[in-house]
């Protein structure tokens, strides 16, 4: 096994449940009573293509040196010392406690890389705990449900990002993986060695009641704060004709048709050459953090002067960050020939932002409150698409059809072979295609796949990630076999 992860956190946050999920067996005792785990337990684990060792630890406790709790804490500290990285688990439903803060500081002092894991994220009320988790100083929380297996693709990505592909895909493990036979029937064995998960291919329905995080961005004076004030029905944010009044990222709670919304108003984002003051640089950085924390980002454009260079740069940033974009053409009340202007704006949207074909764009007047319901309907629909998951069976039946319709091209006299496709993540949708010679695959054929996915599975207007892998197993083959 190439690396070791220690699962740590205060008692009863779900550490042993996550341990069982990763090893594929119920090896650790799980109970609602704090302190069930007293010793550290180590076992081989598997998370999709990642093979590693995982250590389950006792819940961190503040205790006297001679007490049982103190000895449990010593075991946990030893596990942190032995591990290459730490999965610091919090209970998103219960929120952050003083104990979480105390032990987060201890983990930071250890100097070990950390993934902040927000467990029980499926529970109602967990969103507040997610927001509070940022105060621990351990980075962006990765929301999961260890009990139900939700969020495992995102946890896998977070581990790879933390340790780096070179570290987690070591050659000695790839030699083993290269010999594995991978077929659609084997998908259920990818999480854990012997896991029996009856819900493995069950695609959960979109939860339209779950709280939603929305960032509102745009050039200075595009009307972002005015829009939020109208949504909230109060003058919560300072507005005026002067560009750049908003200095930091301000959040506000809102409810739309019974759904809880967290709105982030951001400082106007200027070109780098125009960002001079230190305070303004910090404001723009704060806005970037808001984008990364948001799920959907509303790009507010001034309909009287839309699609300037900076508007396109902001949109490109949002797409590269993998967020779900929606355009609001603001100040629509100032437009005279609305039908002609709207047709022109739709044409420019499709032409200037082809990487998110079908991007939703809505004319509004933030000052008069016109078009806000229509805007929010499009926000919710875009969020649903951004969260969409497609079963492996449907994907590969579709793949057979598109290959039959348009076979992969021949490169250097040899036809490329496409073998298999699976979805490895959502938010945004991410897919892996197993093929021969991925480096030789023309980008035009990759776009053919992406455009086909959009059309067939109704996924307009969101970023779609598609990676090519060699080997029959789309998760293997990242390193060449030793000669």
Swiss-Prot record:
Keywords: GTP-binding, Nucleotide-binding, Repeat, Ribosome biogenesis. Residues 388-472 form the KH-like domain. It comes from the Bacteria. GO terms for molecular function: GTP binding. CDD domains: EngA1, EngA2. GO terms for biological process: ribosome biogenesis. GTP 2 binds at residues 218-225, 265-269, 330-333. SUPFAM superfamilies: P-loop containing nucleoside triphosphate hydrolases. Pfam families: KH_dom-like (PF14714), MMR_HSR1 (PF01926). Residues 3-167, 212-387 form the EngA-type G domain. PROSITE patterns: G_ENGA. InterPro entries: G_ENGA, GTP-bd, GTPase_Der, KH_dom-like, KH_dom-like_a/b, P-loop_NTPase, Small_GTP-bd. GTP 1 binds at residues 9-16, 56-60, 119-122. HAMAP family: GTPase_Der (MF_00195). GTPase that plays an essential role in the late steps of ribosome biogenesis. Belongs to the TRAFAC class TrmE-Era-EngA-EngB-Septin-like GTPase superfamily. EngA (Der) GTPase family. Associates with the 50S ribosomal subunit. This is GTPase Der.
